[in-house]
Amino acid sequence: MSKDKLWGGRFTQPTDKFVEEFTASIDFDKRLYHQDIRGSIAHARMLGKQKIIPMADVEKIVQGLQEILAQIEAGTFDFSISLEDIHMNIESRLSAKIGEAGKRLHTGRSRNDQVALDIRLYLRDELVEISAYLELLIDSLIFQAEKNIDVIMPGYTHLQTAQPILFAHHMLAYVEMFKRDIGRIEDCLKRANVLPLGAGALAGTTFPIDREHVAELLDFPAVTRNSLDSVSDRDFALEFLADASILMMHLSRFSEELILWSTSEFKFIELSDGFCTGSSIMPQKKNPDVPELVRGKTGRVYGNLMALLTVMKSLPLAYNKDMQEDKEPLFDTIDTVKGSLKIFADMIREMRVNVATMRQAAAKGFSTATDVADYLVRKGMPFRDAHEVVGKSVAYCIAEKKDLPELSIEEWRSFSDKIDEDIYDAITLEASVNARRATGGTALERVKAEIERAKVGR
């Protein structure tokens, strides 16, 4: 018989040593210790309130669990692989400390609903922290936007110069992305923040428990409504992994731009030395390792989403041991996202913008060609005709190695007699930027308003 196992009563042979090691999860689920103890204390108090176990036992259980919590946080608690997981390690130690009272703790619950509770508690805490990290990153973006409020840079499509924009406008684009990420995290929290404890192994419990009381003790606004779903649901974890994948995609896109902008070919920005590394052979190198690594870690998070989706895709109701594989993808993603956000927020705040280089780049590539077309439209020309006229003028400039502002008025009028001296005022970088005053545009007055809106709306 497996005498050392809390579930060993029906077994006549000990667990194979390799099986014990293969099935144990304590190496990674021990990080749930705080949530496991919080859940157990709430469960014990409910059992006492409902007169399912004596209040004297409840006090012993609570005190014992608090002592175990202190031991774990002090690093003096010895975790055992033979006890499989965090739940059994804590319960076994509790029973050893306080005797029979500790054996009453598991009344009316299963490890199935216990672990579901622990993961929800853990994720709930982490979602709040991730939202806070996102807010810090948004703060850094707003800081850069305000610091460089009137800096003009080229905007791109297909990575080709398109139209001039404000650098601040570009920073605010990422503010919008990360605000959506916060919204998704908040939505995920709504679905994670539901109490599963009380579902038992799969069918509920025969004891007169009060699930709503446990929910109140643990600050859950609601309890789950179906015991089968309660123990088999990992949608909230999958939803977080999907949200995290989108979040990391945003960081990866930003990383790619920072990597490009910091090259000697662009020279738009300079990252602080503290966020870069050198080369072991090339002494001149300053490598943007942080954005490169964040870009690389994005694939890791995508993989975690695929891993858990694959684990869950064919599981019959209710709990299956496969679901033990939910924790490592979840924990790894949480660690990756938090680390990436923290370092990104600090890196962006310390980033230096090369104002002159950005402006010089914005003045190249016929970036105000659309403004010429808009000018002709305001003079009465249909847009498609204006588009063709400007296309021909650009072709002429390429052949003559000129830019649009360098054309004489005679050259301009060779393309259209609607063009007058005021064309030159219409195609300056400032005129191009500030003409785009509609909501969402890059005009200075609009960008300033959006910065204030971003501050107030948080």
UniProtKB/Swiss-Prot annotation:
This is Argininosuccinate lyase. GO terms for molecular function: argininosuccinate lyase activity. It is found in: Cytoplasm. Pathway: Amino-acid biosynthesis; L-arginine biosynthesis; L-arginine from L-ornithine and carbamoyl phosphate: step 3/3. Its EC number is 4.3.2.1. One of its GO terms (cellular component) is cytosol. Its main location: cytoplasm. GO terms for biological process: arginine biosynthetic process via ornithine; L-arginine biosynthetic process. Keywords: Amino-acid biosynthesis, Arginine biosynthesis, Cytoplasm, Lyase. PANTHER family: ARGININOSUCCINATE LYASE. Belongs to the lyase 1 family. Argininosuccinate lyase subfamily. The lineage of its organism: Bacteria, Pseudomonadati, Thermodesulfobacteriota, Desulfuromonadia, Geobacterales. It catalyses: 2-(N(omega)-L-arginino)succinate = fumarate + L-arginine. It comes from Geotalea uraniireducens (strain Rf4) (Geobacter uraniireducens). Signal peptide: none annotated. Pfam families: ASL_C2, Lyase_1. InterPro entries: Arg_succ_lyase_C (IPR029419), Argininosuccinate_lyase (IPR009049), Fumarase/histidase_N (IPR024083), Fumarate_lyase_CS (IPR020557), Fumarate_lyase_fam (IPR000362), Fumarate_lyase_N (IPR022761), L-Aspartase-like (IPR008948).
